[in-house]
Curated annotation (Swiss-Prot):
Organism from which the protein derives: Bradyrhizobium sp. (strain BTAi1 / ATCC BAA-1182)
Keywords: Cytoplasm, DNA damage, DNA recombination, DNA repair, DNA-binding
InterPro entries per the UniProt record, alphabetical: DNA_helicase_Holl-junc_RuvA_I, Hlx-hairpin-Hlx_DNA-bd_motif, NA-bd_OB-fold, RuvA, RuvA_2-like, RuvA_C, RuvA_C_sf
Entry-linked NCBIfam families: ruvA
Any single GO CC term annotated in Swiss-Prot or TrEMBL for this entry: Holliday junction resolvase complex
Localization in the cell: Cytoplasm
Region (Domain II): 65-143
Record bears the keyword Cytoplasm: yes
HAMAP family for the chain: DNA_HJ_migration_RuvA
Protein name in the entry: Holliday junction branch migration complex subunit RuvA
Region of interest (Domain I), ranges: 1-64
Region Flexible linker: start-end pairs: 144-154
Amino acid sequence: MIGKLKGLIDSYAEDFVILDVGGVGYQVHCSARTLQALPSPGEAATLSIETYVREDQIKLFGFRSDVEREWFRLLQTVQGVGAKVALAVLGTLPPADLANAIALRDKAAVARTPGVGPKVAERIVTELKDKAPAFADVDPGVIRLSGAIEDSRAPQPIADAISALINLGYGQPQAAAAIAAASRAAGDKAETAQLIRLGLKELAK
């Protein structure tokens, strides 16, 4: 099985890249986000690989990190999610945002993925909530906020600040992560306006 490829970018197509490794061109399917991040043809690149072997074909899927590859595998444990949908999800949400969306059960963030409807998005955030392994880069503050929001225990300034950032167009995972960081910086007695201001600074980094 192929676990990693390191070579030169030969060419791109809509959903895959040809990676030249020692004169052999490997067709590697990638998410849109990964393809956009890869260098120009002729430059070097390294991809973590997931190899699918079937009776009639061998298919390679490429990722910028082992963490992204693990998410690709985990997503496919959800009913109705195959390789194509898993790649699409990772093309819409980078691993950290996906982890936060699952922690917050933010199915709307997942449903922004082309080809993912509300039912599949609901299954992803529900079935993976307790499966997200140690590699998931979830902000601890987001995890605490998730429980507080679900139980209606979140302090009103924090809840209002998250709502304000969402109204400004930010996704719930982004807003929650930013306000979690703002709350750590400002302390427990911070007011809504201060949290919003600090949250916007976090989002601008």
